[in-house]
Amino acid sequence: MLQADFVRAFVNKCAQFGLSVGLETCGNFKWEHVHDFISDFDFIYFDIKCLDEELSTKYTGQSNRTILRNLEKLAATAGTSKLIISIALIPGITATEENISSLIELCKKLGITSVRLLPYHTLGKGKYVELGRKYLMDDGLKITDEEVREIQKRLESNSIHCIIEGF
């Protein structure tokens, strides 16, 4: 969280007016910058990609150690009722047997009971073209409704509530 001082002031001001405030984060922040106000959010969407450190480094360019450590601290500090894991379901990358099993294990370990499933799509591809950047994802990547529902069933059979968005 690069603008922690602003976010802290904003959350406090919103609370004065009785406004609900949510946070969406990839979790790659310094805990000492947010520990004193992270519990003030009404809900937190926490993005998780690959739970395997080697795959995380391969696909995101960095280790997921800080992210997972912050998730553990967040679950302990803010409480798991506010916490919703978000995961983009990318075939062969995040929508794998191993990654979903690791996600279930992580949720059970931390007591997290809600997950947002975000099926992969190519809607952002045009932005890359407009910016003159190469789109690195394979055009053939597709996740079917059936595959998404199967992942949803696996999570829900482990007492993890699922929200499917962009489906």
What residues fall within each predicted segment?
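Conserved AdoMet/S-adenosylmethionine-binding subsite of the radical SAM
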Residues: 1-123
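Auxiliary Fe-S-binding modules of radical SAM enzymes
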Residues: 89-167
